Amino acid sequence: MQGALRIGTAAFNAGDHRAAHEAWEEPWLALESGTADERLLHGLIQYAAATHHARLRNWSGARRLAASAAAYLSALDDGYREMNVAAVRTHLRRLAADPEFAERRRPLSLQHDGAALTPADLSFEQLASVATLLAEEYEAFDATVVDDAIRYARGELGDDDSPPEVTATRSRGFVGMLFDFADTRDGRAVVYDRLSRHVERRRSRERDVDGLFE
């Protein structure tokens, strides 16, 4: 649950609202209806959807989803699961009353344990989940390229993927490119092009080695 919250929170704050929705959907479907955890994830999923509809200027959809999301979060403690539930409820109620408010203000950032997480704040494995979600969400990205980049990055990290180690090595190699891919929405296409070229070069070397034994 905590991992899904961190992954979805980081994706949402990076502006990838549909990817955040996907991060929460699978654990949400496994929960019993009406439990506190189910209501939290249901509310967050609908907050992401409301924000997406507001971005598309679908005011009626944004209004409906914001009202529903606020209702799901209404019975939860203000800081349930270390999330900024109270602030999100307030934002949702304002969005439900005036969905065009979204044009005048950026979506309220989600916070987990007091921090507005971005992909740069995640462990490598959590970051890899975000990158995978993005590759599945956007047609411009080849999921097999991202999958191989993650595999190569794990090889760079070895057995230690703790956050301090990832932070120290993040600017280099496949690890750095994956962090940039997940964390740089506006320049993501450029980062992906660089990532795909590096992946293809590594694949080519692998094919050359395999050919030695044929």
Show which residues each predicted segment covers:
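Acidic, polar-rich N-terminal leader regions of halophilic archaeal proteins
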Residues: 1-214
